[in-house]
Each structure stands twice: as structure tokens, then as C-alpha cells.
A protein has these predicted regions:
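Patatin-like phospholipase
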Residues: 1-148
């Protein structure tokens, strides 16, 4: 975040890369990686399929976990809180940045996250199950892409 450079993490422990990738600015604390301070990779590259292509992978699978912005009737016409405004802003920008990058993936898995936001950590078990269901449903598309 200090330089604006994209920093692919392709070595070390997966949990460290995942922790950095979930460091949404203003919501979660950035991660120090060497001399760099890292935030959510979605800021610059929310669908790093281009890196997978450069590594020569046979199949690039993207997972779209962006929540659907559906304000309730009572929310319409009301100014949202500052945190909600920030999160929605990141989601909107993320969608615009992700759209062309998603086309580089062979298969896109989209779990039904509904209106759950990343900061709602208490809903993790529900989201994990939705991810599992979406992954199972994507097996035919994955097999087709692999020509299996």
C-alpha cells in the first residue's frame, strides 16, 4: 500500500498470502511481508488469472465472492454509515476491475454469498458451505475445461 505496486506472493505459507489478500483497507490491518505493507490484492488485481497463465497452468479457476448490493426498502434514500460506504465503494470498484480479468479464467465459481460482506466473520461456516456447494456444482465445467 505504500508504493501502489502489485506484489504476487508465490512462496511461503498459503495462510500468509490469504491473510494479506483479505486485508481490506479500513476494515482489517495490513500485513507486513518483508519490507512491504500489503493490503487486499483486489485493490489492483482481484482475479490474478494472468499470473496463473504466466506460470503455465492448465486450468485457471476464479472464485467470485462479491456480495450482491441489494439495499432494503428502508435503506433506500438513507445515507449509509461511513464503514458501509467504504465497503460498498470497494465492492463497486472491485467489480469494475475484476470484470475483464475474470475472462482470463477457464471456469468461474460463484458461491451464493447473497448480501454477506467480508467483515461478517461470524457467518464463515455458512459461507464455507455455500462455497463447497458451488465448487461441487462447478465440477462438470471443470471436467469439460480439462477435457476429462
Amino acid at each position: 500500500i505504500l508504493t501502489g505496486d502489485e506484489v504476487p506472493i508465490d512462496d511461503g505459507y498459503a495462510y500468509e498470502a490469504m491473510r494479506a489478500s483479505s486485508s481490506i483497507p479500513g476494515v482489517f490491518q495490513p500485513v507486513v511481508h518483508g519490507k512491504r505493507v500489503l493490503v487486499d490484492g483486489g485493490i489492483l488485481n482481484p482475479v490474478p488469472a494472468n499470473y496463473l497463465r504466466a506460470l503455465g497452468v492448465d486450468l485457471a479457476i476464479a472464485v467470485d465472492v462479491m456480495p450482491v448490493l441489494r439495499p432494503s426498502e428502508e435503506q433506500l434514500g438513507r445515507v449509509p454509515s461511513i464503514p458501509s460506504t467504504l465497503i460498498n465503494s470497494f465492492d463497486i470498484m472491485g467489480r469494475l476491475v475484476a470484470a475483464p480479468l475474470t475472462r482470463l479464467a477457464d471456469v468461474v465459481i460463484k458461491p451464493d454469498v447473497g448480501e454477506v460482506f467480508g467483515a461478517e466473520l461470524w457467518r464463515a461456516p455458512e459461507l464455507i458451505e455455500k462455497g463447497r456447494e458451488a465448487a461441487k456444482a462447478a465440477i462438470p465445467a471443470i471436467c469439460k475445461a480439462l477435457k476429462v
